[in-house]
Amino acid sequence: MSTPLIPPAPPKKTLQLYTPQYYGLCTLGGLLACGTTHSAITPLDLIKCRKQVNPNIYPGNIAGFKTILSKEGLRGLYTGGMPTLIGYSLQGCGKYGFYELFKHKYSTLVGAQKAHEYRTSIYLAASASAELLADIMLCPMEAIKVRVQTSNPRFANTTREAWSKIVTNEGFGTLYRGLAPLWFRQIPYTMMKFASFERIVEALYTYIGKPKNMYSKAEKIGISFAGGYMAGVLCAIISHPADVMVSKLNSNKKAGEGAGAAAARIYKEIGFSGLWNGLGVRIVMIGTLTGAQWLIYDSFKIMCGFPATGA
């Protein structure tokens, strides 16, 4: 009696870089990286936004936590959590997905040699292009988040209610009145975030000196977190004045007042020093946030069978 033949196992499908599937997974990785991390630090963001709008509202960050907890309860610490989750998940899709796309397209456009020689410029151009599009996705939820977090009495109990009230009473365009300041804040931030991360990670691999194929997955992820945290500190500093202005514009813009006129009035009221309110907490917040985002994003890429960024 003959032994039945066992059909050979189908060859394992390998994932290819720079394919629609690759960009789709990078987009999903960006959603996971940004949506989860921004949601997790909602209490820090809440205190930061309120201090930007009213510097005297809390004597310090710890006092802010205690005050909110005692007056508004644990739920109060996560005021604005839902628009944060929705908005930054959408932004993460665009930020990381488009960055990978534009980085490859721009590198291909100039050729391999020039792409390496001018790689920092490629990182800057790709990240600026990606953020320009990502902020269009973020802006409505950012406007709702700031309004909910800084209004007293409470503006709305749900994201849907806040959206309805703004659109009905002020018009849909109100949700985008902070887009230009958001670009002013986020594009330099993202350019610094991606370009500095890429170069810091490159420097870390060079400093350690091992061949890249000798690193374990844990080591690669550790390098991504370290590089992300260092890049985040730089991001916080360069983007903070615009972050303050976005908070002010979304909470303190008079009816019929243009964004430029409102920004000029607010600057006259708070001065240059006022643009730096809340910087300390933002450095801690953005450093941790950026490190965690790169950790999640590169962990997801490795899990999908792709190399970590810079590896």
UniProtKB/Swiss-Prot annotation:
Domain of life where this protein originates: Eukaryota
Gene3D superfamilies cross-referenced by the UniProt entry: Mitochondrial carrier domain
GO cellular component: mitochondrial inner membrane; mitochondrion
Organism phylogeny: Eukaryota, Fungi, Dikarya, Ascomycota, Taphrinomycotina
Ranges of the Solcar repeats in the UniProt entry: 21-105, 118-203, 219-303
Mitochondrial intermembrane side stretches: 1-23, 89-120, 193-220, 291-311
Protein name as it appears in the record: Probable mitochondrial phosphate carrier protein
Pfam families: Mito_carr
GO BP terms, alphabetized: copper ion transmembrane transport; mitochondrial phosphate ion transmembrane transport; monoatomic anion transport; phosphate ion transmembrane transport
Keywords attached to this entry: Membrane, Mitochondrion, Mitochondrion inner membrane, Repeat, Transmembrane, Transmembrane helix, Transport
Mitochondrion found in the keyword field: yes
Family: Belongs to the mitochondrial carrier (TC 2.A.29) family.
Protein localization: Mitochondrion inner membrane
Annotated PROSITE patterns: SOLCAR (PS50920)
Topology of the protein relative to the lipid bilayer: Multi-pass membrane protein
Mitochondrial matrix topological domain residue ranges: 45-67, 142-171, 242-269
Transmembrane stretches, start-end: 24-44, 68-88, 121-141, 172-192, 221-241, 270-290
